[in-house]
Amino acid sequence: MSSKYPRSVRCCLPLCALTLEAALILLFYFFTHYDASLEDQKGLVASYQVGQDLTVMAAIGFGFLTSSFRRHSWSSVAFNLFMLALGVQWAILLDGFLSQFPPGKVVITLFSIRLATTSALSVLISAGAVLGYVNLVQLVVMVLVEVTALGTMRMVISNIFNTDYHMNMMHFYLFTAYFGVTVAWCLPKPLPDVKEDKDQIATIPSLSAMLGALFLWMFWPSFNSALLRSPIERKNAVFNTYYALAVSVVTAISGSSLAHPQGKISMTYVHSAVLAGGVAVGTSCHLIPSPWLAMVLGLVAGLISIGGAKCGPGCCNRVLGIPDSSVMHYNFSLLGLLGEIIYIVLVVRHTVWNGNGMIGFQVLLSMGELSLAIAIALTSGLLTGLLLNLKIWKAPHVAKYSDDQVFWKFPHLAVGF
């Protein structure tokens, strides 16, 4: 039987992270330069504010959203920041290299930083399914592989289906969810009694998770509209996302009370479901013609998320063998699928309204994009999960899953624990 003492990453982590950072610095030195044009100076402030919103979402929102576990709050916040910082650097280079052929100098603009931040956000969402089951070295590998897979997916879909940046990135809800769930399926499963103890929600960390949900709730309209070019589409995206999020909050609190035998409200259900509307309208937020439709989507999404939070973890554990403590499948994959279906319906409606007879062709294209995104997510997630199972990463023992003591120094604890 293997030892349950924590496996030290003292040599592995610094060597891996610092070598990778040195390589990134060299790549930036030889292959990047800043945009010297003056064309976008008028919109510089507005563009920077959108990028700032995305950074707040990533660093504070997703960082604190996953910090509700009693014994895994430090790692959730700090590891998310680490993945964000690394993912943005790699995404800027990768997007620049993939967007030009033959490869040349990568021009860094505020838009490219926004695009890279959204790519890094995908890793933070996927990591919600595996945080606590992997160490920081494994997360480094996951960041590199997922950002590369997402960038490749965007390039392939753009070249085959001629889609814009927004549509490419909005497929990422499904991509990140299925990528994260597939990686979690490949990892060693936690011990049942240990998992029950470690997954307990503490009061103070749960408040921190709700704080993260509030930051995400405030800035999600910026995320859904970040890559849209047309001012009218950006305005529609912001409005529709706000309406959907507002209804999600009402549905989350009401549904949480309904799901409890005594009518009590669960903080876990609330901070899972308040964002449901933003996810559901993400793909089609710029096409929704009226507020009531966005509000209906927010209502349906909130109910799906509450149902997933109540029944999902047990179902995923029993049927799929996935320790989905963050309800990844219900909060992102099902809601992302709902958003994709609504997008297809709106595209068909727009095609009929304009008198274009190619309805079947439009549906076929949309289904092709959706299927390709899921296929790439499952394939890359499976390869990543198998890669993370290699012993060279010194993964934590299953008895030490979701435990900050494995990674952090606690002055009041004995040496070696």
UniProtKB/Swiss-Prot annotation:
Residues that span the membrane, as ranges: 12-32, 44-64, 77-97, 125-145, 172-192, 203-223, 238-258, 265-285, 287-307, 331-351, 358-378
Keyword Transmembrane (UniProt): yes
Molecular function terms from GO: ammonium channel activity
Any one GO BP annotation for this protein: ammonium homeostasis
InterPro entries in the record: Ammonium/urea_transptr, NH4_transpt_AmtB-like_dom, RhesusRHD
Main location: membrane
Keywords noted in UniProt: Membrane, Transmembrane, Transmembrane helix
One Gene Ontology term, aspect cellular component: plasma membrane
Subcellular location, record wording: Membrane
Membrane topology value: Multi-pass membrane protein
Source organism superkingdom: Eukaryota
Short name of any one Pfam family annotated for the protein: Ammonium_transp
PANTHER family, sorted: AMMONIUM TRANSPORTER (PTHR11730), RH-LIKE PROTEIN IC (PTHR11730:SF100)
Family assignment from sequence similarity: Belongs to the ammonium transporter (TC 2.A.49) family. Rh subfamily.
Protein role: May be part of an oligomeric complex which is likely to have a transport or channel function in the erythrocyte membrane.
Protein name per its UniProtKB record: RH-like protein IIF
